[in-house]
Amino acid sequence: MQKNLTRWLLTCCIMVVAMIIVGGITRLTDSGLSIVEWRPVTGILPPFSYDTWQAEFAKYKAFPEYNAVNYGMTLSEFKFIYLLEFVHRLLGRATGLIYILPLIYFYFKGIIKNRDILSYIIVLLLFCVQGFMGWYMVKSGLVNHPSVSHFRLAFHLIIAVIIYHLLFYKLVKNCCDILLIPSQINLKLPLIFSVAAIAMIYVQIFLGALVAGLDAGLIYNSFPLMGGNFIPIEIKDNFISFKNWYDPVFVQFMHRLGAYSLSIIVIALIISLLKVKNPKLNKVAFYLSIALLIQLSTGVITLLYHVPIIAASMHQFFAIVLLSVVIWCYSLIKNS
């Protein structure tokens, strides 16, 4: 039965990652405001007939995005953005069901013990918060300025990442072997660096969402400098101000700084793992190197080529991959 628990956790992790990636594509294609109602139960089926499609299109036309951004859009074009948002919402519903139904079964079968149930309930509550946060985010764009709040977008993403983190950590603990390392070997430094790396990845994901929300990837499409300067001229004289977090230039600059900081932390983690001279930790160090390299490369490509959807989606995906490898590393060390 433990194998069934492992398969369930793996399925939930895959579903959450799919939801994150589809959500990212929804943002990149400006599809998020195409469904202007929140119907958690009755909205599980898309329009099928011509009349129902026209009715949904009419609802969309009543909100500012149509007139300000997509005036003259055809029904076929509307169907594309509508179905992307619909798939994103459907994935959210499906993931919730795939989580809660087996959870009830595993608990009453005694596979999930009473001592562990609280953490699973926390994940369930986060799913509920995530659904509300998604609508709260969409609602922010159904106004005169048809653009969702970049802060709400960032929190919507972070909640999804937290859900994934909790599920993946349980998965790793459930199926990975314990590290057999002599007691005289000190793993304190790798543990500290792994915690720091996890924290910095969260910061970077949050900043990345702010970049996406402000379309900040469409400016200063050069690397490593921004307009010939390390610190762009727009923020040199006014660096410490909360208003900067509404400025695409500042947010992009902070995301770049975050990338440099994360790289230093992950490289330090890799070096500390290699010094232990343990085959399993050496394997983790190798995977960390690959994940970091791909993550940095996709980030630079996304910037240089003005945010192509495939590159941006890969960049988001490998942020989750990098987080996963660091969580695996942390779990191995913590539970050794």
From Swiss-Prot:
It comes from the Bacteria. The keyword rRNA-binding does not apply. Its cofactor is heme b. It is a multi-pass membrane protein. Its EC number is 1.17.99.9. One of its GO terms (molecular function) is oxidoreductase activity, acting on NAD(P)H, heme protein as acceptor. Interacts with CtaB. Belongs to the COX15/CtaA family. Type 2 subfamily. This is Heme A synthase.
